[in-house]
Amino acid sequence: MTHPKELPLASLQFYATAPYPCSYLAGRQARSQVATPSHLIHADTYSGLVANGFRRSGMFTYRPYCDGCRACVPLRVPVAGFQPSRSQRRAWKAHQGLQSRVLRLCFVPEHYQLYLRYQAGRHAGGGMDHDSIDQYTQFLLQSRVNSRLVEFREPAPEGQLGTLKMVSILDILNDGLSAVYTFYEPDPDASYGTYNVLWQIEQTRQLKLPHVYLGYWIGESPKMSYKAQFRPNERLVDGVWQPEPRDETVGSPRQG
């Protein structure tokens, strides 16, 4: 793991949190390394942090800093070489009729209600299915960097809004897009999550930027292992972005 002093971020300080229960691997303790102060983390600085394995949650910029565990591996997709799988092509075809609208971060009651349905349907009992408006806002709608909120709706007559199906929060970096969080209608027959990643890959191509950062790949966690299905991909190992292992076999857990 790259030590903070090796980063070109001399104005920042880094501290390790106390241990807390891991959200992805049962029975394990996690720790994070947090970059501070947040008001100095502007767009350029944040791009450098993401390239070094950090992520953003609200105003907090962090990366895993766990004792004796390196299961969380930063993963990004080089969009120029991306080739969708057969199932990914099906997901794109199924949902390409959705209409996207890119907005500044803003609170919309309809978004919040969809967020609660998503948490209840996909992550019931995970602690976020009863988030208050304040918790939702702090988690997704507070940012000091170049962030956007993207709505995905069913088609509707001109002048009307179609049914909301998905909302995605993303950050625009110097070298690509960073997928912060996506929530959607918990329809077991839909593939909204897969479609969203494909949409971000296509947007990144249109912006003529090289990468989509998908956060942490965790091979042992079905919730996080799906990211390796977007190929080819690169992982940050010992401070260096490396191509995925050629002999890796990737399963296909349902990712919505």
Curated annotation (Swiss-Prot):
It is found in: Cytoplasm. Functions in the N-end rule pathway of protein degradation where it conjugates Leu from its aminoacyl-tRNA to the N-termini of proteins containing an N-terminal aspartate or glutamate. GO terms for biological process: ubiquitin-dependent protein catabolic process via the N-end rule pathway. SUPFAM superfamilies: Acyl-CoA N-acyltransferases (Nat) (SSF55729). It comes from Methylibium petroleiphilum (strain ATCC BAA-1232 / LMG 22953 / PM1). The keyword Amino-acid biosynthesis does not apply. Its EC number is 2.3.2.29. GO terms for cellular component: cytoplasm. It comes from the Bacteria. Keywords: Acyltransferase, Cytoplasm, Transferase. InterPro entries: Acyl_CoA_acyltransferase, Asp_Glu_LeuTrfase, N-end_Aminoacyl_Trfase, N-end_Aminoacyl_Trfase_C, N-end_Aminoacyl_Trfase_N. PANTHER family: ARGININE-TRNA-PROTEIN TRANSFERASE 1, ARGINYL-TRNA--PROTEIN TRANSFERASE 1. It catalyses: N-terminal L-glutamyl-[protein] + L-leucyl-tRNA(Leu) = N-terminal L-leucyl-L-glutamyl-[protein] + tRNA(Leu) + H(+); N-terminal L-aspartyl-[protein] + L-leucyl-tRNA(Leu) = N-terminal L-leucyl-L-aspartyl-[protein] + tRNA(Leu) + H(+). Belongs to the R-transferase family. Bpt subfamily. The gene is bpt. The keyword Coiled coil does not apply. Signal peptide: none annotated. One of its GO terms (molecular function) is leucyl-tRNA--protein transferase activity. Pfam families: ATE_C (PF04377), ATE_N (PF04376). This is Aspartate/glutamate leucyltransferase.
